[in-house]
Design a protein with these regions (language model features):
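Phosphate/ribose-phosphate-bearing ligand recognition and processing surfaces
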Residues: 85-177
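Glycine-/small-residue-enriched capping loops at alpha/beta junctions
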Residues: 1-112
Length: 177
């Protein structure tokens, strides 16, 4: 039986304005405000977000934690830590960690009964993960989640740049054809 993937959308835009239950933050292991989407989410949520993540102290790559959304339209934020790509290291391990990152997102979202979620491109910015490989891993992990769960969660992939947007759009078009 073919699954209906109409609950997945690809959006090129500002994730901080997403009207969803939860926004995913591409966080660093120390959970302190950093650059890129992490900076934008902390700015939009207000100083309470930085205080809320302090209680966790640390989050290993592949894992995630959840906090309230504070000044965001979203009621919660999942802070997910992706791998830092280094092609001189074990790249297969990096791939497994990126997959685990998205698994952690979906597990937390399910645990907290999140009905709609906005997810950025994790690790493909300053963490330098190859965008095409990351997109493939994201889709494999997302499809595994959707095909094995009863979730009706709406998933919005927010892409900041054209390359990620085009990669994600192609994957979704293939899926729906």
């Amino acid at each position: 039986m073919r699954k209906n993937y109409d609950n997945i959308q690809i959006i090129r835009g500002d994730i901080t304005t997403a009207k969803v239950d939860c926004i995913v933050n591409a966080a660093n292991s120390w959970l302190i405000p950093g650059g890129g989407v992490d900076h934008a989410i902390h700015q939009a949520a207000g100083p309470e977000l930085a205080i809320a993540v302090k209680k966790f102290r640390h989050c290993d790559p592949g894992n995630a934690v959840i906090t309230p959304g504070f000044n965001l339209k979203a009621t919660s934020v999942i802070h997910a830590v992706g791998p830092i790509w280094n092609k001189s290291e074990n790249t297969e391990e990096h791939e497994q960690v990126l997959s685990k990152t998205y698994q952690s997102i979906y597990e937390l979202a399910t645990k907290h009964a999140i009905q709609s979620i906005a997810i950025p491109n994790i690790s493909t910015g300053v963490y330098d993960f190859p965008k095409d490989l990351a997109a493939e891993i994201v889709w494999q992990t997302t499809l595994a989640f959707l095909n094995t769960s009863q979730s009706k969660m709406k998933i919005f992939f927010y892409c900041f740049d054209a390359e990620n947007y085009n990669l994600y759009t192609r994957f979704l078009q293939k899926l729906k054809s």
